[in-house]
């Protein structure tokens, strides 16, 4: 895929994370896999395929219904990769393990970097680097829940 074709996937990728799950079949490969520690507490091996990705995104939006992402840097591309640095913000509505009830209604903001590999005009692999510590601190989480798949 060309650099410009890869760059064209950045906007729809952001829109997908902003909650437009209708984009999934258009931009995500059937055998998609994410290498990430989701803030929802599931392990990385559970994020395989389109439906798992939609479930992950839906889970995050259940905790932060007004969550929105903006791309701050990028897209940076080569023949088969797309990289973006983003900022996300939203209002916590409860449901995160370990977060105190007084965190409900709190505005949170955090950043991350996504590295994606493309194949056949779609996104096939995803490596996420999210500032989860900042997210947890803003919620007042004192003990981070164990994330399956890492050191277990």
What does each model-identified segment do?
Residues 1-152:
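C-terminal and inter-domain tail/linker signature
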């Amino acid at each position: 895929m060309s650099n410009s074709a890869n760059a064209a996937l950045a906007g729809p990728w952001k829109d997908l994370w902003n909650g437009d799950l209708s984009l999934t079949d258009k931009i995500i490969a059937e055998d998609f896999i994410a290498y990430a520690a989701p803030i929802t507490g599931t392990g990385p091996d559970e994020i395989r395929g389109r439906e798992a990705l939609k479930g992950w995104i839906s889970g995050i939006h259940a905790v932060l219904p007004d969550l929105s992402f903006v791309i701050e840097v990028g897209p940076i591309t080569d023949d088969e990769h797309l990289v973006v640095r983003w900022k996300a913000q939203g209002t916590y509505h409860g449901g995160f393990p370990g977060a105190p009830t007084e965190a409900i209604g709190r505005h949170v903001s955090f950043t991350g970097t996504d590295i994606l590999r493309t194949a056949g005009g779609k996104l096939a692999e995803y490596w996420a680097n999210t500032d989860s510590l900042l997210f947890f601190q803003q919620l007042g989480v004192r003990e981070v829940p164990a994330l399956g798949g890492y050191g277990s």
